[in-house]
């Protein structure tokens, strides 16, 4: 029976390309690391964390510490769209230490629109890094935008004529977001 168990363990090891480390071998006491919550805690299970940070924009998802260049969402099936996006990705300058994925919302966008989204996300990453440097661990450094900001980011486009927001607080949040993230589109 012991030999059979040894065989199973060897098979498991061959499935993984990389050596699997125990967390105690990788992270030392008092070491400060930047993580992102990828799944909230539920019941008895704690939150799932990742050191592979991703920041969603309107047309792309930026992966600031994953140097893989540009990718395309698997949900974009049309070969012509994929070819056009690949061409755009070859033309824009993606920092070498970063990667990005073009979202489905970016499938019919221009080079300038995708590049503008990239610049916005790079600025967000710079702010996140600055906040991390100036904070004392453990600390919340950045939080995904609330519903108003996410909706504006994902739904607002050149065809949007009016935005109706309920309440003064919601209006102020929407106004602030539009001024900061979409200044060209912003008018009272």
Give the residues covered by each predicted segment.
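Single-stranded RNA-binding surfaces
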Residues: 1-186
């Amino acid at each position: 029976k012991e030999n059979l168990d040894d065989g199973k363990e060897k098979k498991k090891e061959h499935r993984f390309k990389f050596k699997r480390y125990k967390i105690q071998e990788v992270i030392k006491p008092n070491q400060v690391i930047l993580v992102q919550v990828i799944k909230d805690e539920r019941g008895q299970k704690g939150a799932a964390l990742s050191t592979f940070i991703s920041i969603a924009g309107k047309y792309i998802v930026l992966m600031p510490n994953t140097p893989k260049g540009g990718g395309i969402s698997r949900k974009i099936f049309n070969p012509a769209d994929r070819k056009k996006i690949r061409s755009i990705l070859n033309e824009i300058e993606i920092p070498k230490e970063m990667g990005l994925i073009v979202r489905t919302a970016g499938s019919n966008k221009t080079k300038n629109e995708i590049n503008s989204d990239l610049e916005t996300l790079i600025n967000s990453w710079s702010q996140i890094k600055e906040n991390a440097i100036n904070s004392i661990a453990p600390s919340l450094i950045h939080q995904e935008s609330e519903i108003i900001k996410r909706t504006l980011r994902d739904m607002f486009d050149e065809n949007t004529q009016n935005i109706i927001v309920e309440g003064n607080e919601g209006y102020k949040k929407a106004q602030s977001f539009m001024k900061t993230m979409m200044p060209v589109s912003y008018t009272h």
